[in-house]
Amino acid sequence: MRTEYAARLPVDWRDYVELCKPRVVLLMLLTVIVGMYLAAPGWVSLRLIAFTLLGIGLCAGSAAAINHLVDRHIDSIMARTKKRPVAYGRVSVKQALWFAVIIGLMGLSLLILFVNQLTALLTFVTLIGYAGVYTGYLKRATSQNIVIGGLAGAAPPLLGWTAVTDQLDPQALLLVLIIFTWTPPHFWALAIYRYKEYQDAEIPMLPVTHGIQFTKLNIYLYTVLLLVVSLLPFVVSMSGWIYLLGALVLGIRFLVWAHKLYFTDKPVVAMQTFRFSILYLMLLFVFLLVDHYF
């Protein structure tokens, strides 16, 4: 394995940035910001925003680094991930572990000292849920790994909300529910596109265990459910007409992609659906934010 020869390969600072999965973390931090602003009747202080984003971002980077560490053997098999820093051997197991521990402790310390203890606790639970429960167990144990593990990935807007209010509110849980419902169609579309790689790595993703067509049906059904769930902020008067129109347009467009995916055998459509799902979530939360102030 390449990881055995890590000491022979040069380590670049960009490898440590890659360990943190920056693109994933940036999308996550967008949902944190939206959670913060939705929790506040007015504007949120820049100081609180800075410490919240830095603390949660460092913890998210720590969880991502642990994911690289635990999945290094799987990553070395899959074409999409075989050149990741730990899998390829540019960063050793020991280096990755120390990096994850240090930035994780830094993030939690910032949240405890400058935000609040509730947010720090929830962030820690989320870190353990993703890095420990999902990465360490669920990913290899069940085809519902994404569904169950999605709870950890859906937490960021709740963390942003509690950073401002220092309490759990039902409205914040609606934001969690949106991301929780979005997660399966998002990841299953990628799993269809990377079906052979997951099969070779012996990861029990839904297309591998139940077949591609069954997975397409589940993507379709979850996308319908997501469209319904995404309207709940308007139903409970958490948001207004701007958000409603945005959610409807985005939801219908996502449903069009799910429909197209169900009736085609072209792998590229699965990747296009996956990419749109990222744009969908980003724009949906932008609509929430815009609607809140306008």
From Swiss-Prot:
Top-level EC class? transferase
Provide the primary localization: membrane
- What is its subcellular localisation? Cell inner membrane
Pfam families (alphabetical) = UbiA (PF01040)
Q: What is this protein called?
A: Protoheme IX farnesyltransferase
Q: Which terms does the UniProt entry file under GO BP?
A: heme O biosynthetic process
Q: Where in this chain does the entry annotate a coiled-coil region?
A: none
Q: How does it sit in the membrane?
A: Multi-pass membrane protein
Name the pathway: Porphyrin-containing compound metabolism; heme O biosynthesis; heme O from protoheme: step 1/1
Check the record and name the CDD domains matching this protein: PT_UbiA_Cox10
Source organism per entry reads Legionella pneumophila subsp. pneumophila (strain Philadelphia 1 / ATCC 33152 / DSM 7513)
**What HAMAP family does the annotation carry?**
CyoE_CtaB (MF_00154)
MF GO annotations: protoheme IX farnesyltransferase activity
- Keyword vocabulary terms for this entry: Cell inner membrane, Cell membrane, Heme biosynthesis, Membrane, Transferase, Transmembrane, Transmembrane helix
Other remarks on this protein? Carbon 2 of the heme B porphyrin ring is defined according to the Fischer nomenclature.
Check the record and name the InterPro entries matching this protein.
Protohaem_IX_farnesylTrfase, UbiA_prenyltransferase, UbiA_prenylTrfase_CS, UbiA_sf
Spell out the family assignment given in the record's similarity comment: Belongs to the UbiA prenyltransferase family. Protoheme IX farnesyltransferase subfamily.
Give the record's GO CC terms.
plasma membrane
Segments spanning the bilayer are 24-44, 48-68, 96-116, 118-138, 145-165, 172-192, 224-244, 245-265, 268-288
Disulfide cross-links: none
Report the function annotation for this chain. Converts heme B (protoheme IX) to heme O by substitution of the vinyl group on carbon 2 of heme B porphyrin ring with a hydroxyethyl farnesyl side group.
